[in-house]
């Protein structure tokens, strides 16, 4: 059986946690930040967990994560 290919776009965006879930950075926190409140930017800082419905899809895209 051939090696499975990793989806490189997904590999750059998602990391697997120790419990097997995936985490990712939140959107809207890259540019055009001056008009956004400090509270909004602060709340966008922590990594978010991928929903359970999308987990199996990421398992296929990142077979070695």
From Swiss-Prot:
Residues 1-50 are annotated as: Disordered. GO terms for biological process: translation. Keywords: Ribonucleoprotein, Ribosomal protein. One of its GO terms (cellular component) is cytosolic large ribosomal subunit. It holds the Pfam family Ribosomal_L35p. PROSITE patterns: RIBOSOMAL_L35 (PS00936). GO terms for molecular function: structural constituent of ribosome. Residues 10-44 have a biased composition (Basic residues). NCBIfam families: rpmI_bact. Belongs to the bacterial ribosomal protein bL35 family. This is Large ribosomal subunit protein bL35. It comes from Nitrosococcus oceani (strain ATCC 19707 / BCRC 17464 / JCM 30415 / NCIMB 11848 / C-107). The lineage of its organism: Bacteria, Pseudomonadati, Pseudomonadota, Gammaproteobacteria, Chromatiales.
